[in-house]
Amino acid sequence: MSVRFSSASRRLGSVRLSSPGAALGAGNTCGVPGIGSGFSCAFGGSSLAGGLGMGGASCGAFTVNEHGLLSGNEKVTMQNLNDRLASYLENVQALEEANADLEQKIKDWYEKFGPGSCRGLDHDYSRYFPIIDDLRTQIISATAQNANIVLQNDNARLTADDFRMKYENELALHQSVDADINGLRRVLDELTLCRTDLEVQLETLSEELAYLKKNHEEEMQALQCAAGGNVNVEMNAAPGVDLTVLLNNMRAEYEALAEQNRRDAEAWFQEKSASLQQQISDDAGATTSARNELTEMKRTLQTLEIELQSLLAMKHSLECSLTETEGNYCTQLAQIQAQISALEEQLHQVRTETEGQKLEYEQLLNVKAHLEKEIETYCLLIGGDEGSCVKSKGQGGPGNQTKDSPKTAIVKTVVEELDPRGKVLSSRVHTLEEKSTKVNNKNEQRIPS
């Protein structure tokens, strides 16, 4: 008769019974992590063997017979079991001490380099301080020289711009004066033409007056010659016209007409000259005021452009300073971020190691508890088998004798359920009594659950 117990992480072996004695074999394989050691034991007529390895823990088999509790080999096996158990306990104690040492180191590290620590990284940078001060002094001196050169360059550029603006202003003023001179030349040409026209008219009138005077003299001479002759002509005619009076009247009329023309021409000339002089004066005043206003506006524009250039230079200098400051702070921020990342990496590594040590410690504690429970179970089994062995021995007597008296065997089977991490979930003990009357015949049975 045989039976096999199976579970997710355990295996129970077989139980063998024989007539001279009772043999009980049980195998229990537990999928729990171990520390790489093994154990085996034997009690009296029973033998117990087991092993604890990295892959799991296995509990061997034990045999009960009627020859007593401990034989020579069984004592050695028991001693081996005790030695291995002591070694296991020493290993557990060593691991606990190592874990405590590691926890103390972690605590010391947190006290020295933790977020609340005032020491920070325990590095001595005092030997670098003179070098840093020297480099800082050189950087400040180079920055000042660079700023001085930039300022000189800006001043030279502003001076060149100032001279360029002055040249442009003088050139514009020169062109304006040339334009005014050309305008005045055109006016002068017009006045010259008008004067020439008036002179031509004056000459024409003078010639006409001379011609009239000459005609008048000739007529007067002809009349005087005619009056001085001896010719007497008597005519009974109407009284004639007095030519002298007529000539005098004509002369007076022509003189009045010439005088009137002269006065009209002189008045027209004076009027035109006055209007032209007034226009020239007005244009000159307007030109002067416009020129003054243009000069003032150009001067204001030049001043504003100089201020704009200075403000642009100041803006550029401030932008350069801002860029340099931002670069320095970005570099410092990157260094601080790198230090923070390194510290976080160290902290993560320490936490990982701590969690690994904690997990290993919990596994060892679970293995320890499991082994202690197995040892207690084996002690219970050994206690029950001892009574069975004493009873069988009293009935059979010493030695291996063949009798037909009935034998009683008590078989205890421990069934344990384990989780994947090796922790015991439940434990059950099955007890079975069997009687056998056969002599020297070994019956191999597998006990049902």
UniProtKB/Swiss-Prot annotation:
Residues 425-449 are annotated as: Disordered. Residues 1-73 are annotated as: Head. Residues 74-389 form the IF rod domain. Residues 132-223 are annotated as: Coil 1B. Gene3D superfamilies: 1.20.5.170, Single helix bin, Vasodilator-stimulated phosphoprotein. Residues 110-131 are annotated as: Linker 1. PROSITE patterns: IF_ROD_2 (PS51842). InterPro entries: IF_rod_dom, Keratin_I. Heterotetramer of two type I and two type II keratins. Interacts with KRT6A to form filaments. There are two types of cytoskeletal and microfibrillar keratin: I (acidic; 40-55 kDa) and II (neutral to basic; 56-70 kDa). Belongs to the intermediate filament family. This is Keratin, type I cytoskeletal 27. It comes from Rattus norvegicus. The gene is Krt27.
